[in-house]
Amino acid sequence: MCRNQQLCRLDREAAPEIYALPGEWVRNKLPERIAAADAVILSDYAKGVITSELIRQVQAFAGPDKLVALDPKPRPGLNFNGLGLVTPNRNEAMLLAQMVGAGTDEVFPPEEVCRRLHERHATRLLVITLGADGMLISREGRIEQHVPTAARAVFDVSGAGDTVTAVLTAALAAGATPEAAV
């Protein structure tokens, strides 16, 4: 840390293949774990645990009334159609929408990004985090609200997206509206 900012981060990781969930665990343990939960959050930093098939299984085990949320890390072919909450950051949203300029903050047409993400994935609720610019709440591919941020002294933004997904999911599972949850 220097002047309240993280200077360096070093991650050492093994090959993604070790992260795959055993099929037996998914069939035998996952349904009971989901049944005991008020909501489910899927997040794996694109390590290979979250697959289109696992998302389908989680949705089936959760049923239509239990919130399933995804903090997406874009990967080719990942299908997350019909999830209750998806919380990409600006760059992830651009990549998921397959838009030119993805990965930069220079070009971000929010209406088009939200429309494309809804068309491709039919998410019920999309909340795009925009860093210092706040968050966008979108339903049915339309922006419903832009929530600005309040200035704060931030020492480390690592895990900010995880925190947003966890807090939104907990609030929504407890009955809050998306606007109140944000």
Predicted regions and their residues:
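Conserved N-terminal subdomain of the carbohydrate kinase-like
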Residues: 1-41
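Glycine-centered loop/turn positions within well-structured domains
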Residues: 8, 133, 166
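Active-site donor-binding loop signature of nucleotide-sugar glycosyltransferases
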Residues: 12, 88, 149-150
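Short strand->helix junction
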Residues: 15-17, 47-48, 154, 175
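Short, charged, surface-exposed secondary-structure boundary motifs
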Residues: 19, 95-98, 154-158
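Buried hydrophobic positions in well-ordered alpha/beta secondary-structure cores of metabolic enzymes
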Residues: 37-43, 135, 161, 168, ...
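Conserved phosphate/ATP/ADP-binding segment of small-molecule kinases
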Residues: 39, 47-144
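Conserved post-catalytic alpha-helical subdomain immediately downstream of the catalytic base
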Residues: 124, 130, 150-182
